[in-house]
């Protein structure tokens, strides 16, 4: 499964960049790897005697064939039973819908998933885009009357007219979908941070469990003094980090089975509502992105420039002065803040790496080991917390520099994860941090979204259910940016 997707998306080289983690994963499970070869060895040694089909009569072979055909027909019929279901995990939608590799593999097996993946790669696939069937012309409710007094977050695109003027079926489906969507509206938080500088941080494997008053006081301060999104969820997308970035930065759902950000850059797709592009449109003086790992990992050098940023990373303008894994978030801040701190206006994006998995042996966990050594957790969990202390040090440094430059009160800082710390799964580490057995259907995806500015006088509790898809539209509203809310998968949390 992984090999097919990686190779078809140009990711073979990325696998070699993580060869140390791959080898560690294999050696830690060597017993199970050896067991995989036991059936093959058994067949080689005893197969000739136990599986001699030459003695089976034609009648017996026909019976076996008929049973196999019956099973195949039954399976096909079972797939079609729930074809009208709206459940994306129904048998029908898993088989005929957008390819969800992990779910399809679990339901139909590895070979079926690979066959579907390869066939769609070779022959293409047309998605079935469903439009909102709710009628537009209905009796106004009290909520709708209130909304008429507000302003819809839309732009001048006339999707009804565009639908009539195109013969392209795919474009027509998109226009119809956008036209059917209910827009977000201006609200009490519209323009709250208009004119502010913005620093957006996607923190590797970050979670709410990394926020601690004693271990990570700066992260704790930002959460407890800022917007507190109590029901925020971060899905585990198919391509982990880069798909998490895609959702965070575009407000769109990444396509399963491909590197969505990489493919979008390859196809020169425009993202007019990203903070990078919006900042350039407004004449922002400095629009930079940074990453403290290899510059072209996941093709970041292509997709971050495609959404409006001037990009620096290891091997492309950023030298941290040490060759370790993972690299230090603190050192990245120390090396980059001077690039923009004195600019009249700046829009900055960071993709951190200190929190990367492999917590029992990596450099960041070891660097801060003394600070967690007395905690009553397993070594893996202590390593995870130690790695996030490095992120906290980076944020402490950033806030101190902003305050010294007199820009803490007019800078909005947004920090969230790319995905939950799934490297802890095999050690049941997330449950250990939570203090109870974590539900793997929903609870494990609950996370923290830190949104804070030095100008905030008191925290704001937000109990609305939201996800990483909602970050961009929410920020766009709060920064007073012009955007069309119908064209994003996420929605403004307050709109």
Give a label for each model feature.
Residues 36-37, 130, 150-180:
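Helix-hairpin-helix/helix-loop-helix acidic hairpins
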Residues 88-94, 157-162, 177, 394, ...:
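Alpha-helical scaffold segments in carbohydrate-active enzymes
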Residues 138-162, 322-328, 332-336:
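Basic, amphipathic N-terminal segments that precede the first structured/catalytic domain
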